[in-house]
């Protein structure tokens, strides 16, 4: 069975429609119990596309790091975040869309067409968009965005682990692994935990119920 790889067909179709500044957008960090949600917007240029781009989840960490460096060297890139406070206030979907909108706004070239991973398009964007389900595995620009966003967020979680050791964020990136959940029970919550997420909320409620 042939394994599908991302290609340039979606960008080519947009160029054929007359668009000139075409970018891919993806986010990472919707599922973790801690840390921000991070989005990247990437404008690739034909003839300067790094080899081996793919969905960041399919790549080992060292390869992601190397590709992220290549992308930053040859593409226009913007990375943005939505904070834990925004996630808890808005909900994770709206916070993800906010991070995407911020990433798009941070590009040096105002895009006129955005290829967005998923099936929903953030509201209020001023340019044409196309949502592509599993776009990080189908579209080169989105694959590049997924890699940049993943590397950027992983680095944030490594930094946060130095401030709050014991939760394993360097390896679990804030996801609800068994060790992370056990650390929550043993060490309690940090300011970087998402109170609106059920496992965290349950622990917070338990702590409140036993307080004097």
From Swiss-Prot:
Keywords: Cytoplasm, Endonuclease, Hydrolase, Manganese, Metal-binding, Nuclease. Its main location: cytoplasm. A divalent metal cation binds at residues 26-27, 117. The keyword Manganese applies. Residues 20-209 form the RNase H type-2 domain. One of its GO terms (biological process) is mismatch repair. Its EC number is 3.1.26.4. InterPro entries: RNase_HII, RNase_HII/HIII, RNase_HII/HIII_dom, RNaseH-like_sf, RNaseH_sf. Disulfide bonds: none annotated. SUPFAM superfamilies: Ribonuclease H-like. The keyword Hydrolase applies. Its cofactor is Mn(2+); Mg(2+). It is found in: Cytoplasm. It is an enzyme of class 3 (hydrolase). GO terms for cellular component: cytoplasm; ribonuclease H2 complex. Manganese or magnesium. Binds 1 divalent metal ion per monomer in the absence of substrate. May bind a second metal ion after substrate binding. It catalyses: Endonucleolytic cleavage to 5'-phosphomonoester. GO terms for molecular function: manganese ion binding; RNA binding; RNA-DNA hybrid ribonuclease activity. Belongs to the RNase HII family. Endonuclease that specifically degrades the RNA of RNA-DNA hybrids. This is Ribonuclease HII. It comes from Cereibacter sphaeroides (strain ATCC 17025 / ATH 2.4.3).
């Amino acid at each position: 069975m042939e394994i599908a790889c991302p290609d340039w067909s979606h960008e080519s179709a947009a160029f054929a429609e007359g668009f000139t500044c075409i970018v891919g957008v993806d986010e990472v960090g919707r599922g973790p119990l801690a840390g921000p949600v991070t989005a990247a917007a990437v404008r690739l240029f034909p003839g300067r596309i790094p080899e081996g781009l793919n969905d960041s989840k399919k790549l080992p960490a060292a390869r992601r790091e190397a590709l992220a460096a290549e992308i930053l060297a040859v593409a226009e890139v913007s990375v943005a975040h939505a904070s834990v406070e925004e996630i808890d206030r808005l909900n994770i979907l709206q916070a993800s869309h906010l991070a995407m909108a911020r990433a798009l706004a941070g590009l040096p070239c105002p895009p006129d067409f955005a290829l967005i991973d998923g099936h929903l398009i953030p509201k209020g964007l001023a340019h044409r968009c196309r949502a592509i389900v599993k776009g990080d595995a189908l579209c080169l620009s989105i694959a590049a965005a997924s890699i940049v966003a993943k590397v950027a967020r992983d680095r944030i979680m490594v930094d946060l682990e130095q401030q709050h050791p014991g939760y394993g964020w360097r390896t679990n990136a804030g996801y609800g692994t068994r060790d992370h959940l056990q650390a929550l029970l043993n060490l309690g919550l940090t300011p970087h935990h998402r109170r609106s997420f059920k496992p965290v909320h349950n622990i917070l409620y338990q702590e409140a119920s036993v307080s004097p």
